[in-house]
Swiss-Prot record, chain B:
GO terms for cellular component: cytoplasm; nucleus. Residues 1-20 are annotated as: Disordered. One of its GO terms (molecular function) is protein dimerization activity. It comes from Arabidopsis thaliana (Mouse-ear cress). One of its GO terms (biological process) is regulation of growth. Its main location: cytoplasm. Keywords: Cytoplasm, Growth regulation, Nucleus, Transcription, Transcription regulation. InterPro entries: bHLH_dom (IPR011598), HLH_DNA-bd_sf (IPR036638), PRE (IPR044293). The gene is PRE6. Pfam families: bHLH_ILI (PF23174). Interacts with HFR1. This is Transcription factor PRE6. Belongs to the bHLH protein family. Induction: Circadian regulation with a peak of expression at midday.
Amino acid sequence: MASADKLINTYVPEKDVFALHFLQSLSNLRTQNPLNSPDKSIDRVRKIKKAAYVSMARAAGGTSRLWSRALLRRAAKDDNKSVRFSRRKRKVTWKISSKRKRSNQRAPVVEEAAERLRNLVPGGGGMETSKLMEETAHYIKCLSMQVKVMQCLVDGLSPK
Amino acid sequence: MSSRRSSRSRQSGSSRISDDQISDLVSKLQHLIPELRRRRSDKVSASKVLQETCNYIRNLHREVDDLSDRLSELLASTDDNSAEAAIIRSLLNY
């Protein structure tokens, strides 16, 4: 059983870590665009949404989680930048060959549901099913934290 | 059990996860999802948990969308409905 002793860590930082990252992100949005306010509200919403996901990924551990790495990579690609990742000791495969995934089949009905999950979790496409579930647990915790932060902000800004 | 493990460890250098850990992960997921937390019985199947997880994630994404929308509106508005709102807006450079 020695090889199965991998600790499954789903530690998530406190809400104020997420809040701080998000507020910084939001205030940066304005300093990037001080004089000309984006005309289209759709652009504004898109930028805020992106700030939410990126700040969430950073608050949750940046490049130490597969889903946050995938999220940050995706966001950086949008901006035509590149993300610097520290070299990980474990070999990271960017593409899991289909042969490997197939060899890891759990019950087919579980695999089918896992496939749908892979499309929802950032970076899920290359993950083994068990890793996918671990990442999903962490992703869900962080997402709900981020939602709480945003709700607080909306409540603060709303008319009393 | 050991024969299963050895046949799997052939494929890669990473440690193999046992089926026990899979069901452990499934139950962890189950606790995280509000829908399923209410039915604390262990009778929820793994595929049901994964299915509900998908729904939950989709809902969370939708909430982020909705809240982003409202935030954008609220930040852009110039009526200072409350002192708190004015403070927050000035903090964020709006």
